[in-house]
């Protein structure tokens, strides 16, 4: 009897182990739910910088094509900046320094005051570009007065621009781009600690110079540094090459506990992390900044680009760089993934599986499936658009294949080009439902032309099938991220 009891107990343990191994985790709502925007946010606004303040407002400044003034607008939402009234807070000098090429303003709130960092040339030499700072003690920087704090002095007086400031472990730093007379290039990247918001302290360190092929097209440029911190790491993006379709983002990374003034602490990406996309019609994305969503749960990439490739004349004289927004995603290794500059219009989202929370809907050889660690981000991004079949439906358009949609065929789900037929429109349309396994936060997609069949994963492949069991409902529930 004792031997039988032991055998029975062992069998039960084995069965429980098998069940545990075969049962996926049940997800909770994602820590970073979806956010969407409509691009472009602002026409003819380059080098954009958006700062979210504790007063509930976003503050937005950028280079204007006339290069003659600093403008500012604010709104309580990011999308609201598109229509917010714009105020000129400072105008170039009629003569002397700060009299030409007013470029790349950034607004920061430091120790109870507002500061704007910008670059400017002189009326006697428009290319004598240096970095300058404005200060305001007003609660509302759009209506307050501004004081010129003067030039940010550097040990070497040379072409310098694109100052940005950030704090790591309680220490404020300044990063910027500057011509190093000892090098055969246009600008390199430097970093220093700050004694106050308009003065650097100690000896600056050069942390990057343009040496890679994609950094030296047209001009040899590293410029426009911007910093985002995540998971104990500091990521510094920068722009490279000429300001045409070759403009792109590179990235330096360092541990937040490292000595950031030691050039060896920084590792450079071997390839651009964000560049032109012919597929989406976006050219020369760059000179970015970072902000956060209204709920503080998503990091947002702010940048400019053009929607055409060929420029007549000097790109510097082309006024049509536009400010754009899109969400930053994070890879499993903790590095940021910017994907591609998405098409104009509504921005795409990702859909994670309810019961396999690390897996996302993506296409591979145009077959739709769920998969983890999708480093080619755009394969897992879809625009939620008005359904091709109408009648209150939605369709899911591929981010990197505009005009291609998730559609079912023989109950299998593929990403295919819209051929304009009624059959395609019906197959590519879904009714958006509350999640079948999580009605509060989840989403389910019911086939338009096969009511009762839902988009679900089965052996990692997407299909449309009826749902009846608890497992069916889990497989047919997703979260938008």
Curated annotation (Swiss-Prot):
The name of this protein is Extracellular exo-alpha-(1->5)-L-arabinofuranosidase
Respond yes or no to whether keyword Hydrolase is given for this record. yes
Keywords assigned by UniProt, alphabetized:
Carbohydrate metabolism, Glycosidase, Hydrolase, Secreted, Signal
Subcellular location per the Swiss-Prot or TrEMBL entry: Secreted
Question: Catalysed reaction(s)?
Answer: Hydrolysis of terminal non-reducing alpha-L-arabinofuranoside residues in alpha-L-arabinosides
Enumerate the residues marked as the site Important for catalytic activity, responsible for pKa modulation of the active site Glu and correct orientation of both the proton donor and substrate. Answer: 162
- Temperature profile: Optimum temperature is 45 degrees Celsius.
Where does this protein hold substrate? 186, 287, 321, 363-366, 379, 457-460, 475
For the protein in the UniProt heading, the enzyme class is hydrolase
Q: Which residues form a coiled coil?
A: none
**Molecular function via GO:** alpha-L-arabinofuranosidase activity
């Amino acid at each position: 009897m004792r031997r039988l009891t032991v055998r029975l107990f062992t069998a039960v343990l084995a069965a429980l182990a098998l069940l545990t191994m075969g049962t996926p985790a049940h997800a909770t709502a994602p820590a970073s739910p979806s956010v969407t925007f409509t691009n472009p946010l602002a026409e003819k606004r380059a080098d954009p910088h958006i700062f979210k303040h504790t007063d509930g407002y976003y503050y937005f400044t950028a280079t204007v094509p006339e290069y003659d003034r600093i403008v500012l607008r604010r709104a309580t939402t990011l999308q609201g900046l598109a229509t917010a009234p714009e105020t000129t807070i400072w105008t170039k000098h009629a003569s002397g320094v700060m009299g030409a090429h007013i470029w790349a303003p950034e607004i920061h709130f430091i120790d109870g005051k507002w500061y704007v960092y910008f670059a400017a040339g002189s009326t006697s030499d428009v290319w004598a570009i240096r970095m300058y700072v404005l200060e305001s003690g007003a609660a509302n920087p759009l209506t307050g007065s501004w004081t010129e704090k003067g030039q940010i002095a550097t040990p070497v007086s040379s072409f310098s621009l694109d100052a940005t400031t950030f704090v790591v472990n309680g220490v404020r730093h300044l990063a910027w781009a500057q011509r190093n007379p000892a090098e055969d290039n246009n600008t390199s990247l430097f970093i220093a600690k700050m004694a106050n918001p308009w003065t650097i302290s100690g000896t600056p360190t050069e942390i990057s110079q343009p040496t890679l092929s994609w950094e030296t097209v047209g001009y040899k440029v590293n410029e426009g540094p911007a910093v985002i911190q995540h998971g104990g790491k500091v990521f510094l993006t920068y722009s490279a090459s000429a300001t045409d379709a070759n403009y792109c983002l590179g990235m330096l990374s360092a541990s937040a506990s490292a000595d950031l003034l030691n050039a060896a602490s920084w590792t450079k990406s071997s390839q651009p992390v964000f560049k032109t996309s012919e597929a989406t019609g976006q050219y020369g994305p760059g000179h970015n900044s970072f902000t956060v969503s209204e709920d503080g749960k998503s990091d947002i990439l702010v940048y400019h680009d053009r929607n055409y490739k060929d420029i007549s004349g000097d790109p510097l004289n082309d006024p049509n760089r536009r400010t754009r927004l899109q969400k930053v995603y994070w890879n499993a290794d903790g590095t940021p993934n910017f994907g591609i500059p998405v098409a104009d219009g509504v921005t795409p989202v990702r859909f994670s599986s309810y019961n396999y929370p690390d897996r996302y809907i993506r296409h591979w050889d145009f077959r739709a499936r769920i998969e983890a660690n999708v480093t080619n981000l755009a394969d897992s991004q879809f625009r939620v658009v008005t359904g091709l079949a109408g009648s209150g439906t939605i369709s899911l358009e591929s981010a990197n294949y505009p005009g291609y949609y998730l559609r079912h065929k023989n109950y299998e789900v593929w990403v295919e080009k819209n051929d304009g037929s009624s059959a395609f429109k019906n197959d590519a349309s879904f009714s958006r439902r509350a999640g079948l396994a999580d009605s509060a936060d989840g989403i389910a997609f019911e086939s338009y032309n096969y009511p009762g069949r839902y988009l679900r994963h089965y052996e990692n492949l997407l299909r449309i099938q009826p749902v009846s069991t608890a497992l069916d409902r889990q497989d047919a529930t997703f979260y938008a991220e």
